[in-house]
C-alpha cells in the first residue's frame, strides 16, 4: 500500500479517536465506556447489598429471605420482638453520629439529578446503605430497592466528581447507575432502563437512552453471573378467562388507587408529625419502630423485612381472603411505623406486597360473584401488584415492565396495563404524582412540572438583575454616551 494511503488511514483513525473521546456532554466513546464502568460498579453494589441482607437475615432469624415468613412463625415470641428492636437500636446509634439523622433514598437521587448537578454525598450513601442492611436484615418492614438505587447513584456521583464531568454527562451517568442498580436487583434490564429514564432523568432521548441501556446490561450481567438468571417470583402461568373481565380490571385499578392514596397519606402524615416525633431522642426512635414491627409480626410474620415470600404465595393463590385483607392493613401500618421511626423506607417492595394482597382479595371476591367468568385470584394478584406499584411510584411504564420481568408472565399484559393506567390517573386526582414527589414537596421542592418549571418558579428577578452598569446624565451628548 502506498505511503500516502497509510498516512491518510492514520489521520482518519486519529480524527475518529479524537471525535469519539472528545471532552464534552455527548462524547459517545467516553460516555459508552463510563456507562459500562458505572453499570458494573452499581451492579456489584446492588448484589453486594442483597447478599449482605440475606446473610444477616439468616443470622437473625435462621432462615433465608425466601422462607422468612414461614420460618419466623415458628420462632419464640421474644425472638420476634428482640431482633427488630436490636436492629433499630444499632441503626439509631449509627444515625446519632450522622449529620442527616436519617437514611436517604430515591427522592434524593431525583433531587440531585434535577437541581443539584448530580451531587450526592458519598458518606450519606454509605451510611444509608449500612443502615438499610442492618434494618432489612433484622426484619424492618421496608424495601431494599430504594436503598440499592441510592447506593448505585451515590457511587456514580463519586465517579463523575472524580472525573470532573460536566453536569449533562454527569446526569446521564447518574441514570446509568440507577438503571444498573434496578436491573441487578430485579434481574430486569428493560425495566431498569425505563425506571432511570422515567423517574430520574425525566425524559427520553437517544443520547441518553444508549448509555443507560449499556449500563443496565452491565448490571444485569453482573447479577446473573453471581446470583443466577431467574425471576424474583415464581408464579403459575395464568390466562385471562374472558374479555368480560376487563371491567373488573378497570375497577381493580380504581380500588388500587384508593389504597395507594391511603398508603401515601399515611407516610406523608408522619412527615407532618415529624416535629412531635422528634421530641423522642433520635437514637431510640428506630428501636421503638423495631419493637412495634416485632409486635405486629407476632400475629403476622409475613410483614417482616421485604416480604417476598408472602408476595410470592399471594401471586400463586395460596392465601385465603381471611388472611389477605388483614395483611393489606398491617403492611401499611408497618411501613408507616418504619418511616416514622427513621428506618428509611424503600416503597417498591411494600407496594408490591400490598398490591398482591389487594389483587388476590379482589380476585377471590370476583370469583365468588362470577365463578364462570373470573380468572384465578393469582392473576388478579399480579394485576393488583402492578396497579398499586404504578400509583405509588408514579412510573407506570417502568413498573409494568418490572412486573412482567419479575414474574416472566406476559399473558396478563393487557390486564396489568389497564389497571396500572387507571390507578395512576385516579391517584393523580387526589394526590401527588408519586411518593417521591411527595417527599420532595415536603422539602419545599416541587418538580411536578419538571426541572425547568421548578427553577423558573424558584428564581427571583433580583438573581438575574445586573448592577454592573454605567450611568450618564440625561443632558449628555450622543458622542459622550458613545465614549
Please annotate each region the language model reported:
Residues 1-458, 462-483:
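Alpha-helical transmembrane segments and immediately membrane-proximal extracytoplasmic
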Amino acid at each position: 500500500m502506498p505511503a500516502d494511503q497509510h498516512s491518510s488511514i492514520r489521520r482518519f483513525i486519529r480524527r475518529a479517536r479524537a471525535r469519539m473521546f472528545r471532552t464534552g456532554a455527548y462524547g459517545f466513546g467516553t460516555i459508552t465506556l463510563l456507562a459500562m464502568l458505572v453499570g458494573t460498579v452499581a451492579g456489584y453494589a446492588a448484589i453486594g447489598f442483597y447478599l449482605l441482607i440475606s446473610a444477616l437475615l439468616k443470622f437473625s432469624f435462621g432462615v433465608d429471605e425466601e422462607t422468612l415468613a414461614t420460618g419466623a412463625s415458628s420462632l419464640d415470641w421474644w425472638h420476634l420482638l428482640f431482633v427488630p428492636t436490636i436492629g433499630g437500636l444499632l441503626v439509631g446509634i449509627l444515625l446519632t453520629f450522622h449529620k442527616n439523622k436519617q437514611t436517604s433514598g430515591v427522592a434524593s437521587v431525583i433531587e440531585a439529578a434535577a437541581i443539584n448537578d448530580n451531587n450526592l454525598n458519598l458518606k450519606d450513601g454509605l451510611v444509608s446503605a449500612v443502615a438499610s442492611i442492618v434494618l432489612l436484615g433484622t426484619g424492618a418492614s421496608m424495601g431494599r430497592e430504594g436503598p440499592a438505587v441510592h447506593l448505585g447513584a451515590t457511587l456514580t456521583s463519586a465517579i463523575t466528581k472524580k472525573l470532573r464531568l460536566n453536569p449533562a454527562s454527569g446526569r446521564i451517568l447518574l441514570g446509568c447507575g440507577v438503571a444498573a442498580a434496578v436491573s441487578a436487583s430485579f434481574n430486569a434490564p428493560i425495566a431498569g432502563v425505563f425506571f432511570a429514564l422515567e423517574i430520574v432523568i425525566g425524559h427520553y432521548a437517544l443520547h441518553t437512552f444508549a448509555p443507560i441501556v449499556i449500563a443496565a446490561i452491565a448490571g444485569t450481567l453482573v447479577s446473573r453471573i453471581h446470583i443466577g438468571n431467574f425471576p424474583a417470583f415464581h408464579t403459575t402461568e395464568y390466562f385471562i378467562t374472558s374479555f368480560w373481565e376487563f371491567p373488573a380490571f378497570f375497577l381493580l385499578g380504581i380500588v388500587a388507587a384508593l389504597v395507594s392514596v391511603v398508603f401515601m397519606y399515611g407516610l406523608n402524615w408522619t412527615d407532618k408529625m415529624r416535629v412531635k416525633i422528634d421530641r423522642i431522642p433520635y437514637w431510640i426512635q428506630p428501636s421503638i419502630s423495631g419493637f412495634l414491627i416485632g409486635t405486629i409480626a407476632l400475629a403476622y410474620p409475613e410483614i417482616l423485612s421485604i416480604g417476598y415470600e408472602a408476595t410470592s404465595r399471594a401471586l400463586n393463590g395460596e392465601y385465603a381472603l381471611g388472611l389477605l385483607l388483614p395483611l393489606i392493613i398491617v403492611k401499611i401500618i408497618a411501613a408507616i411505623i418504619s418511616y416514622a421511626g427513621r428506618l428509611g423506607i424503600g416503597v417498591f417492595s411494600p407496594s408490591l406486597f400490598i398490591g398482591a394482597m389487594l389483587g388476590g382479595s379482589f380476585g377471590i371476591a370476583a370469583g365468588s360473584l362470577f365463578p364462570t367468568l373470573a380468572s384465578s385470584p393469582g392473576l388478579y394478584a399480579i394485576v393488583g401488584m402492578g396497579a398499586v406499584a404504578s400509583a405509588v411510584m408514579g412510573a407506570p411504564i417502568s413498573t409494568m415492565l418490572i412486573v412482567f420481568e419479575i414474574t416472566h408472565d406476559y399473558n396478563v399484559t393487557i390486564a396489568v396495563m389497564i389497571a396500572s393506567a387507571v390507578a395512576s390517573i385516579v391517584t393523580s386526582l387526589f394526590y401527588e404524582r408519586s411518593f417521591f414527589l411527595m417527599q420532595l414537596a415536603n422539602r419545599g421542592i416541587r418538580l411536578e412540572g419538571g426541572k425547568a418549571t421548578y427553577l423558573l418558579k424558584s428564581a427571583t428577578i433580583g438573581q438575574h438583575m445586573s448592577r454592573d452598569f454605567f450611568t450618564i446624565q440625561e443632558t449628555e451628548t450622543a458622542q459622550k454616551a458613545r465614549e
